[in-house]
């Protein structure tokens, strides 16, 4: 089954914790706690709330950026953006047991992360998104197709998660490019019932698969 990663986001309606809770209630098994503007103490407080819930739901919990905190709290791993700690440095700190994901926008990024020891790639953005500042150039379907083709030619085997401005309607076409997973945030949180929206997406993906 193609995996769904939920990336936390604070809105007028929901806190970071509440956003993750609704995704978990909807059946999501992969949470990235992303609190880019928050101090480390706040991230730690939310992570401590989420960790037992993720364990109960058998869901993976990653922290965005906070490598030392991930090690301290013994969560499942981290996701590292282009301006975060380099992946090879994070691997030295965390060892092999932690999951390390990296953000990529080009095939050159993919090669760099692969050589550095990433476990998966978050490739995007698919289109413009309001949940992230300082966006790289949008990829669209053609971008994913091109990068995945280059990966195949180079014998680079890493799971690829599509990210950035993806709606429920986009998912079938994106999966056709050969990506392994989809990362969502705003699409779920803008829904009237985020938990129900998560369930719909997971059910739809099972039908596609």
Curated annotation (Swiss-Prot):
Binding site for 4-amino-2-methyl-5-(diphosphooxymethyl)pyrimidine: 32-36, 64, 103, 132
The protein's enzyme class: transferase
Domain of life, per lineage: Bacteria
The reaction(s) this protein catalyses: 2-[(2R,5Z)-2-carboxy-4-methylthiazol-5(2H)-ylidene]ethyl phosphate + 4-amino-2-methyl-5-(diphosphooxymethyl)pyrimidine + 2 H(+) = thiamine phosphate + CO2 + diphosphate; 2-(2-carboxy-4-methylthiazol-5-yl)ethyl phosphate + 4-amino-2-methyl-5-(diphosphooxymethyl)pyrimidine + 2 H(+) = thiamine phosphate + CO2 + diphosphate; 4-methyl-5-(2-phosphooxyethyl)-thiazole + 4-amino-2-methyl-5-(diphosphooxymethyl)pyrimidine + H(+) = thiamine phosphate + diphosphate
Residues given in the record as Mg(2+) binding sites: 65, 84
EC id: 2.5.1.3
CDD domains recorded: TMP_TenI
UniProt name for this protein: Thiamine-phosphate synthase
């Amino acid at each position: 089954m193609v995996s769904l990663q939920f990336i936390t986001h604070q809105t007028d309606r929901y806190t970071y914790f509440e956003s993750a809770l609704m995704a978990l209630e909807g059946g999501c098994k992969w949470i990235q706690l992303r609190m880019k503007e928050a101090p480390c103490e706040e991230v730690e407080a939310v992570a401590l709330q989420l960790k037992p819930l993720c364990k109960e739901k058998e869901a993976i919990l990653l922290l965005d950026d906070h490598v030392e905190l991930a090690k301290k709290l013994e969560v499942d791993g981290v996701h590292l953006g282009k301006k975060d700690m380099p992946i090879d440095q994070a691997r030295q700190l965390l060892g092999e047991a932690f999951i390390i994901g990296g953000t990529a926008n080009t095939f050159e990024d993919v090669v760099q992360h692969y050589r550095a020891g990433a476990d998966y790639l978050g490739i995007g953005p698919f289109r413009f998104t309001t949940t992230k500042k300082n966006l790289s150039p949008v990829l669209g379907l053609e971008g994913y197709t091109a990068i995945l083709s280059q990966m195949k030619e180079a014998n680079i085997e890493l799971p690829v998660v599509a990210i950035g401005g993806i709606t429920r309607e986009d998912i079938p076409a994106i999966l056709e490019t050969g990506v392994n997973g989809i990362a969502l945030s705003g699409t779920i949180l803008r829904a009237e019932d985020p938990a129900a929206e998560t369930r719909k997406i997971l059910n739809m993906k099972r039908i596609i698969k």
